[in-house]
């Protein structure tokens, strides 16, 4: 059988939210540039989205993401982190138990 996870993922069609794509195409025709709010983090970035700013919801607030050509094929959620890394704790802060 074998592992086919990556093979299947590459050969599937990308998921693009139709509402978002329609808004982007309409804005491309009119030449308008405004921020679009998006809750759909699993939406794949397409060529039509390049040059637009999309505000992606991370669970608390909307993070503005400017779409560049290198981002095509990635998901919107990759650029809007849901967790903040505050660093590792200091070694001096650890409490060492002695028996």
UniProtKB/Swiss-Prot annotation:
Gene3D superfamilies: 30s Ribosomal Protein S19, Chain A (3.30.860.10). Pfam families: Ribosomal_S19. InterPro entries: Ribosomal_uS19, Ribosomal_uS19_bac-type, Ribosomal_uS19_CS, Ribosomal_uS19_SF. Keywords: Ribonucleoprotein, Ribosomal protein, RNA-binding, rRNA-binding. GO terms for biological process: ribosomal small subunit assembly; translation. Transmembrane segments: none annotated. Belongs to the universal ribosomal protein uS19 family. Protein S19 forms a complex with S13 that binds strongly to the 16S ribosomal RNA. One of its GO terms (molecular function) is structural constituent of ribosome. GO terms for cellular component: cytosolic small ribosomal subunit. This is Small ribosomal subunit protein uS19. SUPFAM superfamilies: Ribosomal protein S19 (SSF54570). Signal peptide: none annotated. Coiled coil: none annotated.
